[in-house]
C-alpha cells in the first residue's frame, strides 16, 4: 500500500486497502503494561484459557500467526497425497509442495471422487476468496473417511469469527482433525501476529516441537 501511495502520490490515509481481509476497526486496546515488554510469555498466563473459552475448544496451541502452522504442519508428515480445496489462500498448497508432498488443487465437486486417495485434505472455511461456508456435518464426514486411514483434515478457519456455528473448534480433539484460527483478522490486530492451532494433545505437542 505504501508503494502504491508513493507511485500515485496519494496520501496513505486516503486509501481503502481491499487487498487483505483484516478488519479496519481494531479492538479497543488498553494501555500495555511494562511487564509485557520485559517478561517472557508463560503457558499459564491466561492466554490459552481465554482462547479455549472463546473458540469452544478443549485445547489450543498459540502460534506466531496461523502462517507458522501452515508452514510447519507439512513437515510433520512423510510425503503423501494432499488435496487442497481451491481456490483458496495460496500459501497452503505452496507449503505442502515445498515439503515434498504431491498436491492436487481440487474443486468442491472433486472432493468425493478423490477423497479416498488422499492422505490430507485442506479446506479453508469460510473460503477465501469465495465466501463458501461448509457445514460441520459434511466436514466431519470427510474427516472420518480420512482418519480411518491415518489421514488428516486440516481446516483453516481464519474468517470463522462471524459464523461460529459452522466452526469445528468443539470437535477439534478428534484424532486427525486440525483447525487453524487467526486472531488478527477479525479483531483488526494483525500486528500482534497471533494465531492458534486446535487439535488433539499429541498432535499439538508434535507441532510445538516442530516450531521449536
Predicted features, each with a name:
Residues 1-50:
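N-terminal "arm"/small-domain region of PLP-dependent enzymes with the aminotransferase-like
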Residues 18, 156-158, 180, 195:
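Structural scaffold positions in well-ordered secondary structure
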Residues 44-82, 88-89, 93-95, 99:
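Phosphate-binding glycine-rich loop
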Residues 104-162:
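Active-site phosphate-binding strand-loop segment of PLP-dependent enzymes
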Residues 179-212:
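Conserved core segment of the aminotransferase class I/II
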Amino acid at each position: 500500500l505504501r508503494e502504491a501511495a508513493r507511485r500515485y502520490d496519494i496520501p496513505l490515509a486516503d486509501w481503502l486497502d481491499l487487498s487483505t481481509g483484516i478488519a479496519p476497526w481494531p479492538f479497543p486496546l488498553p494501555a500495555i503494561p511494562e511487564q509485557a515488554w520485559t517478561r517472557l510469555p508463560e503457558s499459564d498466563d491466561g492466554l490459552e484459557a481465554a482462547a479455549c473459552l472463546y473458540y469452544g475448544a478443549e485445547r489450543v496451541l498459540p502460534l506466531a500467526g496461523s502462517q507458522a502452522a501452515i508452514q510447519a504442519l507439512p513437515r510433520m508428515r512423510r510425503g503423501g497425497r494432499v488435496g487442497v480445496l481451491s481456490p483458496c489462500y495460496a500459501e497452503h498448497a505452496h507449503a505442502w509442495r515445498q515439503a515434498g508432498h504431491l498436491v492436487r488443487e481440487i474443486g468442491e465437486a472433486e472432493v468425493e471422487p478423490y477423497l479416498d486417495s488422499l492422505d490430507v485434505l485442506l479446506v479453508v472455511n469460510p473460503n477465501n476468496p469465495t465466501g463458501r461456508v461448509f457445514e460441520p456435518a459434511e466436514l466431519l464426514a470427510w474427516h472420518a473417511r480420512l482418519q480411518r486411514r491415518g489421514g488428516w483434515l486440516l481446516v483453516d478457519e481464519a474468517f470463522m469469527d462471524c459464523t461460529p456455528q459452522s466452526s469445528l473448534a468443539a470437535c477439534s480433539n478428534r484424532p486427525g482433525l486440525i483447525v487453524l484460527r487467526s486472531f488478527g483478522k477479525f479483531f483488526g490486530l494483525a500486528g500482534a501476529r497471533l494465531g492458534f492451532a486446535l487439535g488433539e494433545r499429541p498432535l499439538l505437542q508434535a507441532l510445538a516441537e516442530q516450531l521449536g
